[in-house]
Design a protein with these regions (language model features):
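Class I SAM-binding transferase module
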Residues: 1-2, 6-25, 32-182
Length: 182
């Protein structure tokens, strides 16, 4: 999945990423933010609610720690703005404050790995739509812009028994001498 995102971002670099302001919604470890920067984004807002955001803060600090050619990820310097918050809680002021350069709090492109189980498991689609409605410029783009669900009927008794057995695990009275029953 990661390579598919990288390929899509690089293939669409000129119209949607090069010299553009980008928001990575639910940035997680920041890989899509970094891909957007590799594709030439002027600035990326990496918005993440979890503590995974600390890794991105570390990358930003490391890029600013010293000068010279040997600085790791020097190409991210003054181009990556980390926002530790849920998109629903982000304000334009928070974006302005996080940005290393003066910028309006509207973005040209939104990117997100919003793919939970069947697209909806992690409820990121709603968050992505919230970001689109609040922060995307009228002529902006969203990646991915389409999600397709495909279904097929399947009857696999063995798989069903395995899944059911996992649920029954909590009813074990002697798991290495431990009673797991409530």
């Amino acid at each position: 999945r990661t390579s598919a995102y990288q390929m899509s971002i690089m293939q669409h670099a000129l119209p949607y990423f090069a010299n553009q302001t980008v928001m990575d919604v639910g940035a997680g470890n920041g890989i899509l933010s970094l891909f957007a920067l590799q594709a030439g984004a002027k600035l990326v807002f990496a918005v993440e609610a979890s503590t995974m955001v600390e890794h991105l803060h570390h990358l930003v600090r490391a890029a600013h720690a010293q000068d010279g050619d040997s600085v790791p990820n020097m190409w991210t310097r003054d181009r990556l703005a980390v926002v530790h918050a849920r998109v629903e809680d982000v304000t334009p002021g928070m974006l302005r404050e996080a940005a290393p350069i003066p910028v309006e709090p509207r973005v040209d492109t939104i990117v997100s790995e919003c793919l939970g189980v069947l697209l909806v498991h992690e409820r990121m689609c709603e968050t992505l739509l919230e970001a689109r409605d609040r922060f995307l410029k009228p002529d902006g783009a969203v990646f991915p812009r389409v999600g397709i669900l495909c279904f097929s009927l399947l009857n696999d008794t063995r798989m069903w028994q395995e899944v059911r057995a996992r649920g029954e695990w909590w009813n074990t009275t002697d798991f290495y001498g431990i009673d797991l029953t409530p």
